[in-house]
């Protein structure tokens, strides 16, 4: 079993490890994001972003143009830089539609797509001072040479050129969430909006993003693999470090050293009754001996995310009550995955999961009436997954699944401590979540390598050999260093 655990956490592909020997003395042009020349350990020739070739980006733009009504244009703005304080920015993450269509990972740009002009990109202009403080950015040359824009202009030209394009268009599509005042303040845009000519672009782009290409699926499998390895490694160390904050930090570390650029979202690490809070994110409490911990996490790899949840007892043993409730969630997870196939809808899967969970909760005496079920689980069984965690949100859950869709299956029960049920069940939250690819014949569980069977989890936790550092608990570290044990042990790490 120790061999199995080692094998599970060591399955790291070449894309998950940055080679320390890949370097060149040749001068490489910096465009503010990785290129095959600057990052040969990440990218092959012909790729605009790791794993995605220029031909795929051009194909995406062609498909979007085909969806646009005649004489229409689409305006796609890069994501804005969001500030933590007046001079400290939050880590930048690109708008998914802008990245999907251009491959540009940087802020400050606006892309315009139409049948007549093709892709027109308005790019940020940097001064020597900007470059000294923040480095190079992709400009007009990169737009033409790297992103293969049909036309490229500095952003200062946008008011003049885009106004003319809007005046001669019957409809204008854009995304409200990422809209930039660079164009929304233009008189011609506002006139079109007042005439009802401005439409939401996400209704079109989210359709395109639903079905993943082979290249996208390769990245999603890799992202899921990293998440599984990171979560398993964290689970194995939770016995020595039963602390929400430490486990949150560790899972991010484990994912990033395997190649992930960031977490897909702030991890949910809920110990004990905190697990009954669906999107709990404080992650600031010690986990009591005998309590369960629910960890909902995912990572992002080159623009594609994973989303994975497991619930386990850091002490290494499920209690009989925990096991009874966990088994209900596990069986619901497995039965719903079996129903994943072309033609099924997420709404149908949700109805099926509700029936299974209601039946089980009624038998256990937790529910006195089916009408109370949504107090214990107000969520859907799952959602679409891709470049965003809740991907293609403009597409409803009545859409029949097709090969190439990726969805989550995440049944759960969240019982508040105040809920009117047998006391032994109060304050327990359990969720088991997997990422599922819809195939021609059924499904593929992308997160299938992450253990979820009770006996498997218990055996892994109890047979895992900690190294000397992991064998020492935070409290004992306090004692060794002569510190008071009522101090926050995380200050030591």
UniProtKB/Swiss-Prot annotation:
The keyword Transferase does not apply. One of its GO terms (cellular component) is nucleus. Belongs to the peptidase M24B family. It comes from the Eukaryota. Keywords: Aminopeptidase, Hydrolase, Manganese, Metal-binding, Metalloprotease, Mitochondrion, Nucleus, Protease, Transit peptide. Aminopeptidase which cleaves preprotein intermediates that carry destabilizing N-ter amino acid residues after the mitochondrial processing peptidase (MPP) cleavage site and is thus critical for stabilization of the mitochondrial proteome. Disruption phenotype: No visible phenotype. Altered mitochondrial protein stability. This is Intermediate cleaving peptidase 55, mitochondrial. It is an enzyme of class 3 (hydrolase). GO terms for molecular function: aminopeptidase activity; manganese ion binding; metalloaminopeptidase activity; peptidase activity. Residues 1-19 form a transit peptide. Pfam families: AMP_N, Peptidase_M24. Mn(2+) 2 binds at residues 296, 307, 433. GO terms for biological process: protein stabilization; proteolysis. Gene3D superfamilies: Creatinase/methionine aminopeptidase superfamily, Creatinase/prolidase N-terminal domain. Binds 2 manganese ions per subunit. Its cofactor is Mn(2+). It comes from Arabidopsis thaliana (Mouse-ear cress). Signal peptide: none annotated. Mn(2+) 1 binds at residues 307, 383, 410, 433. Its EC number is 3.4.11.-. InterPro entries: Aminopep_P_N, Creatin/AminoP/Spt16_N, Creatinase/aminopeptidase-like, Pept_M24, Pept_M24_MAP, X-Pro_dipept-like. SUPFAM superfamilies: Creatinase/aminopeptidase (SSF55920), Creatinase/prolidase N-terminal domain (SSF53092).
């Amino acid at each position: 079993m120790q061999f199995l655990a080692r094998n599970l956490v060591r399955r790291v592909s070449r894309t998950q490890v940055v080679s320390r020997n890949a370097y060149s003395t040749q001068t490489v042009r910096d465009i503010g994001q990785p290129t095959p020349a600057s990052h040969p350990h990440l990218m092959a020739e012909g790729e605009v972003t790791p794993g995605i070739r220029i031909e795929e980006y051009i194909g995406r733009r062609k498909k979007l143009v085909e969806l646009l009504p005649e004489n229409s244009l689409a305006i796609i703005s890069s994501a804005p830089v969001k500030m933590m304080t007046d001079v400290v920015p939050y880590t930048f993450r690109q708008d998914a539609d802008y990245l999907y269509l251009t491959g540009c990972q940087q802020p400050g740009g606006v892309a315009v797509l139409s049948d007549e002009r093709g892709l027109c990109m308005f790019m940020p202009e940097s001064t020597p001072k900007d470059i000294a403080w923040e480095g190079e950015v992709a400009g007009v040359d990169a737009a033409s040479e790297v992103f293969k824009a049909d036309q490229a202009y500095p952003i200062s030209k946008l008011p003049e050129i885009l106004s003319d394009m809007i005046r001669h268009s019957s409809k204008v599509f854009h995304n409200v969430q990422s809209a930039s005042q660079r164009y929304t303040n233009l008189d011609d845009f506002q006139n079109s909006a007042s005439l009802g000519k401005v439409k939401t672009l996400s209704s079109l782009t989210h359709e395109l993003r639903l079905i993943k290409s082979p290249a996208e699926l390769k990245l999603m499998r890799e992202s899921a693999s990293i998440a599984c390895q990171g979560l398993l490694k964290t689970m194995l160390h939770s016995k020595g470090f039963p602390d929400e904050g430490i486990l949150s930090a560790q899972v991010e570390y484990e994912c990033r050293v395997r190649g992930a650029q960031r977490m897909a979202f702030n991890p949910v690490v809920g110990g004990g009754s905190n697990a009954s809070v669906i999107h709990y994110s404080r992650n600031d409490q010690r986990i009591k001996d005998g309590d369960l911990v629910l960890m909902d996490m995912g990572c992002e790899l080159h623009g594609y995310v994973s989303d994975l949840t497991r619930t386990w007892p850091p002490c290494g043993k499920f209690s009989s009550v925990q096991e009874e409730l966990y088994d209900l969630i596990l069986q619901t997870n497995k039965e719903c995955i079996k129903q994943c196939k072309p033609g099924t809808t997420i709404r149908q899967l949700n109805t099926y999961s509700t029936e299974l969970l209601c039946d089980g909760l009624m038998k256990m005496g937790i529910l006195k009436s089916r009408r109370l079920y949504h107090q214990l689980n107000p969520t859907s069984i799952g959602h679409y997954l891709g470049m965003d965690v809740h991907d293609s949100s403009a597409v409803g859950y009545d859409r029949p699944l097709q090969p190439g869709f990726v969805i989550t299956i995440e049944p759960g029960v969240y019982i508040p401590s105040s809920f009117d049920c047998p006391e032994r069940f109060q304050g327990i939250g359990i969720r088991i979540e997997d990422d599922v690819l819809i195939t021609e014949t059924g499904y593929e569980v992308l997160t299938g390598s992450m253990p979820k069977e009770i006996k498997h989890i218990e055996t892994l936790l109890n047979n895992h050999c900690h190294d000397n550092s992991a064998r020492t608990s935070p409290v004992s570290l306090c004692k060794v260093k002569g510190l008071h044990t009522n101090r926050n042990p995380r200050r030591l790490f």
